[in-house]
């Protein structure tokens, strides 16, 4: 099991570090664009990166981190267990076992339409519990949801379920993850 305080601190520092890193990369890219514009104003030059591009870069890196953690934790947790027979059992494993290891609680609600769509709901998502005002930390919420989405993507991919995950936290700390299976 992952130490709760260690995980909280790790998530805060990872989000801050990735935001800082993305801002630095965007500044470097914008400096190159400015240099190209000064040297040859008539040539085709890519547009400058905006603040939303920075946020997307940071969220993408956070999701990648979550994918790595989810895939490797799933492999460790399933090392001595029999193979899970069907998709529903694999998703239940992620909701119960993996979520418990990372956030010390299970997913509160799992729904499916039995046609390749699962909705996982967490009524008290630990990574968002400390937020007082929903709008005050939009970037933080986005980063935490990116990590959790990546965690789900990595775990399900390691279980042989290619999918896409869309996270929604309209009223933090309540959040839901819409998992859509890819057709094989």
Locate each region found by the language model.
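C-terminal helix/juxtamembrane-tail motif
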Residues: 172-184
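Eukaryote-biased feature marking scaffold/signaling PDZ-domain proteins and nuclear chromatin regulators
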Residues: 113-115, 147, 160, 172-174
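Mixed-charge, glycine-accented linear interaction segment located at domain edges/termini
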Residues: 148-162
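N-terminal accessory segment detector
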Residues: 1-142, 183
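Structural signal for hydrophobic/aromatic residues that build the beta-strand cores
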Residues: 152, 165, 177-179
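Short beta-strand
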Residues: 109-110, 165-170
């Amino acid at each position: 099991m992952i130490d709760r305080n260690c995980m909280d601190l790790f998530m805060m520092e990872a989000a801050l570090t990735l935001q800082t890193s993305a801002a630095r990369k965007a500044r470097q890219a914008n400096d190159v664009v400015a240099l190209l514009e000064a040297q040859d104003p008539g040539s085709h030059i890519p547009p400058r990166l905006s603040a939303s591009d920075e946020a997307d870069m940071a969220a993408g890196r956070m999701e990648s981190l979550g994918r790595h953690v989810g895939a490797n934790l799933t492999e460790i947790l399933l090392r001595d267990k029999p193979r899970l027979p069907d998709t529903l059992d694999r998703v239940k494993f992620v909701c119960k076992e993996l979520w418990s290891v990372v956030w010390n609680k299970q997913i509160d609600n799992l729904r499916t339409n039995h046609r390749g769509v699962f909705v996982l709901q967490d009524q008290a998502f630990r990574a968002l519990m400390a937020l007082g005002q929903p709008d005050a930390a939009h970037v933080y919420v986005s980063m935490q949801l990116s990590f959790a989405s990546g965690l789900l993507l990595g775990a399900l991919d390691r279980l042989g379920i290619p999918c896409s995950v869309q996270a929604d936290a309209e009223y933090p700390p309540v959040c839901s993850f819409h998992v859509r299976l890819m057709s094989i």
